Amino acid sequence: MATEHVNGNGTEEPMDTTSAVIHSENFQTLLDAGLPQKVAEKLDEIYVAGLVAHSDLDERAIEALKEFNEDGALAVLQQFKDSDLSHVQNKSAFLCGVMKTYRQREKQGTKVADSSKGPDEAKIKALLERTGYTLDVTTGQRKYGGPPPDSVYSGQQPSVGTEIFVGKIPRDLFEDELVPLFEKAGPIWDLRLMMDPLTGLNRGYAFVTFCTKEAAQEAVKLYNNHEIRSGKHIGVCISVANNRLFVGSIPKSKTKEQILEEFSKVTEGLTDVILYHQPDDKKKNRGFCFLEYEDHKTAAQARRRLMSGKVKVWGNVGTVEWADPIEDPDPEVMAKVKVLFVRNLANTVTEEILEKSFSQFGKLERVKKLKDYAFIHFDERDGAVKAMEEMNGKDLEGENIEIVFAKPPDQKRKERKAQRQAAKNQMYDDYYYYGPPHMPPPTRGRGRGGRGGYGYPPDYYGYEDYYDYYGYDYHNYRGGYEDPYYGYEDFQVGARGRGGRGARGAAPSRGRGAAPPRGRAGYSQRGGPGSARGVRGARGGAQQQRGRGVRGARGGRGGNVGGKRKADGYNQPDTKRRQTNNQNWGSQPIAQQPLQGGDHSGNYGYKSENQEFYQDTFGQQWK
């Protein structure tokens, strides 16, 4: 029974039963940092509970907390306190992630409530005790392993080809179900489950890196379209981490060594520069290069830095984009290839010379030379093998040629290329652009009055697949690095532009026309006859049948030069770099692609430090 105190006046006063608040030694430090009294008390309460030490939170986290009003800060700290921090390595970054999630919910007008039910911690703990792996949790992902225990694997970090992408994962599924499944295929290096901070559930996809390529391939065979739960089938395919950047606007006089030195000054982790020279002048490059970095993380950081506009190389802010990653075809498929890719050909080399040089090793089906490279089709693989062994590195018309087996076509890549090309047509449909010095012959097209060529090398479409897919070993001259870049410098591509007015009554059919580049021999100079900037051809007259034409810059329109129009019924895709909607499951994804855009605000300085380094690049059907 509670006792009562009687004062000198004889009146009774209730006893103060509230216990004294215990503060940590860092409480005053929090007040001195500018936190409101109640916020400082709440954070200090977390300190006293032993969930977090003051040394675990850096200045950025405290400063970010000060930006909230008192109610918001208290709600954030309560959510932080209620979170399971047992597997969180960087608690300061985790707190910033909680703050970011809170703001996102506020913007969406949704109630800031507790996250949905997460993983069963008892099962997760049992898994970790059984395997000996570690688990690192951030607001954007859950990373299991990396590296694994020495008892499992003690070798070097796995190389390209050991990672798989797992899509269409049920949102409430976690490591306790994924790990036992995939470890049957082989030893796991790490498993990264992408998380949605707003819901506390996974995003529907994960990346699993195995210790060997064989294990990764086995996982694809075993679990692609595997029913992981009743009615729920996951999709699995080999994933390729991208560590290569495309950089344009490179001075043509620069060498590989100069480019490597210059970009190493402004970025870290640069390991190689892939540079190509002009076919007619080996002393000059083609105005672009590819930068290869140690891994995807360093490449992503370099890309953000180079795209910031603050970094200039040789006084220029260059064009920077992702290059397509290297993808290795199935060894079983490559073992059947009978086509050789020959590069570094001299200008004097003709198809007849190539046929004479290679026919001695076996019967040829076809020889096709395009620019400074060629494809040699053998009737039998043995002949191709002999030719590569004998001719690789040999001198042919003054140049040492390089030979590899051409990589087979990839249908999904072909479909993505078609989408990118159609998008490119729309992007430049109304854009005046003066053509580069070289102009390819007209290529067959479609559309009223004939469509001008896409600007590909002659007869390219017959070799589209091999040409595109081959280049990954030699870093590709164009195909694998996205068509929009083929408008650079010396590239043989027709400029996109409108032609001049056609004469009334005899004009080509409606559609933006093709015109010769200015200043070319045999064509009208700019300002000469028929060179006025044109618009649509006048109506009237007989419509021309479908024919050939080349896209040009400003110039005369008329005669038998075909018109150009937008692709019928084609809607502008999301981006020029990677269209992902309406793709089938079999598309090979790029793992670890950085979050889009250069705006990293609201992340409290943690975006570039291994936080949420991955995104879903695959559309809703993957989730």
UniProtKB/Swiss-Prot annotation:
Region of interest (Interaction with SMN), residue spans: 518-549
Residues recorded as bearing N6-acetyllysine in the entry: K221, K363
Chain positions of motif Bipartite nuclear localization signal: 564-578
Subcellular compartments: Nucleus; Nucleus, Nucleoplasm; Microsome; Cytoplasm
Region named 3 X 4 AA repeats of Y-Y-G-Y: 460-488
Post-translational modification Omega-N-methylarginine, affected residues: R444, R496, R518, R526, R536, R539
Key word Transferase present: no
Gly residues composition bias: residue spans: 550-562
Domain (RRM): residue spans on this chain: 162-241, 243-325, 338-408
Keywords: Acetylation, Cytoplasm, Endoplasmic reticulum, Isopeptide bond, Methylation, Microsome, mRNA processing, mRNA splicing, Nucleus, Phosphoprotein, Repeat, Ribonucleoprotein, RNA-binding, Spliceosome, Ubl conjugation
Region called 8 X 3 AA repeats of R-G-G, residue ranges: 448-559
InterPro entries, per the entry: hnRNP_Q_AcD, HnRNP_R/Q_splicing_fac, hnRNPQ_RRM1, hnRNPQ_RRM2, Nucleotide-bd_a/b_plait_sf, RBD_domain_sf, RRM_dom
Pfam annotation, one family: RRM_1
Summary of the tissues where the protein is detected: Ubiquitous. Detected in heart, brain, spleen, lung, liver, skeletal muscle, adipocytes, kidney and testis.
Compositionally biased region (Low complexity): 504-522
Residue windows of the Sequence repeats: 448-450, 451-453, 460-464, 469-472, 478-480, 485-488, 498-500, 526-528, 539-541, 554-556, 557-559
Annotated region (Interaction with APOBEC1), positions in chain: 400-561
Domain notes: The domain containing eight Arg-Gly-Gly repeats (RGG/RXR-box) may be involved in RNA-binding and protein-protein interactions. It is methylated by PRMT1, and essential for nuclear localization.
Protein's name in the database: Heterogeneous nuclear ribonucleoprotein Q
Organism: Mus musculus (Mouse)
Taxonomy of the source species: Eukaryota, Metazoa, Chordata, Craniata, Vertebrata
